[in-house]
A protein has these predicted regions:
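Short, charged/polar "capping" segments at the starts of alpha-helices
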Residues: 51-58, 142-143
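Short, acidic, metal-binding catalytic loop of nucleotide-sugar glycosyltransferases
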Residues: 32-41
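GT-A fold catalytic core of metal-dependent nucleotide-sugar glycosyltransferases
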Residues: 74, 89-150, 178-179, 185-186
């Protein structure tokens, strides 16, 4: 019992899977979680990694938070050939059920996420028998439908190859997942992940995310879209392509635009390497509280050529939207 007479909340497990390139960023994510959680004293953080143990322990010692447990695994997955947006560390996600064999349930987060909502509310979501829960990846559907419109069927065909139905609009982003670890162990998730990777290696687009969606087909619960809002989706670039988003997902986009419970800094531009990231200042708020020394990137200077390019992209996007909507009217 707490000294104020209120019962202590059930322990809450939050997990990260990183390499040394993203280890420092975990401190910022953790600080955002602690600052916005109604029961911060109940959180147990785990960092699953394949790095030198002394290096990780030394890094964690600098952080302004406690209750962080490093767990080392052997990551013998090969490099992700040709997939610059996917690191080898992404495969550590597949090892979580076995690496954390003493846990029944966990929230998994990528290290380029900040939590603005109460993690306790996410933790207490009823999975209703599902083995995992995540947020539909709106960006994937925008890019897939745009690709189909332009004659590029790779994203659609990748889903079909894995036994997924692109029409169901249930493909989730693997950067934030609520996991029933008992169910994942029971289904042999880690070994089946490895087998699927061996079968399709070099043929997948989002690799670990593709495999997770394939293995959890029919066992994945969809969460409120505000739990995983992508910075790239809110950027000027992708905003000009919203017309490709299926009508049934537009309500999810509206929710994300109105409120964010978690911001996921997707894409190559991150708050720590670019001053032109949507809601980047929110990340910096928690960076300043993390105990880490973060140098801010300098503001980019726009050239005339960039302004012209941006203007042309805007015109081209408007024309694209007009043609796409006209095609929908004719086909309807």
């Amino acid at each position: 019992m707490r000294t104020d007479g209120h019962p202590v909340a059930d322990p809450m497990n939050i997990v990260f899977a990183v390499d040394r390139g993203y280890l420092r960023q975990v401190a910022v994510t953790i600080r955002s979680i602690v600052e916005n959680c109604s029961t911060p004293e109940s959180i147990r953080f785990y960092i699953v990694h394949a790095e030198d143990e002394a290096f990780v322990a030394e890094a964690i010692a600098e952080w302004s938070v406690s209750g962080v447990t490093p767990v080392r695994v052997a990551n013998d997955y090969g490099t992700v050939g040709g997939q610059t947006h996917v690191s080898k560390a992404a495969f550590i996600k597949s090892m979580l059920p076995e690496a954390l064999s003493h846990l029944d349930r966990a929230i998994y987060l990528d290290a380029d996420i900040i939590l603005l909502g109460d993690a306790r509310q996410l933790w207490e979501v009823d999975l209703k028998g599902a083995a995992m829960a995540g947020v539909v990846d709106l960006g994937v559907y925008i890019q897939m439908i745009r690709g189909i419109t332009l004659g590029d069927f790779r994203r659609r065909d990748c889903q079909i190859m894995l036994g997924l139905d692109p029409e169901k609009l249930e493909y989730v982003n693997s950067g934030m997942m609520l996991m029933d670890l008992n169910q994942l162990r029971a289904m042999g998730f880690s070994e089946r992940f490895r087998q699927t990777d061996e079968t399709y290696r070099g043929r997948l687009i989002f690799v670990d995310q593709d495999i997770i969606n394939s293995l959890l087909r029919g066992r994945m619960m969809l969460l409120d879209s505000r739990w995983n809002v992508h910075s790239t989706l809110m950027s000027r670039h992708l905003a000009r392509r919203y017309h490709y988003l299926p009508d049934s997902l537009r309500g999810d986009l509206a929710l994300q635009q109105s409120e964010q419970w978690a911001i996921h800094y997707t894409g190559g531009r991150k708050p720590w390497n670019s001053s032109e990231v949507w809601s980047g200042e929110k990340w910096w708020r928690y960076a300043e509280l993390s105990g880490m020394d973060w140098p801010r990137p300098t503001a980019a200077k726009w050239s005339i050529a960039q302004a012209i390019s941006e203007g042309w992209f805007d015109v081209a996007s408007r024309l694209s939207a007009f043609r796409y909507n006209l095609r929908k009217v004719k086909s309807g």
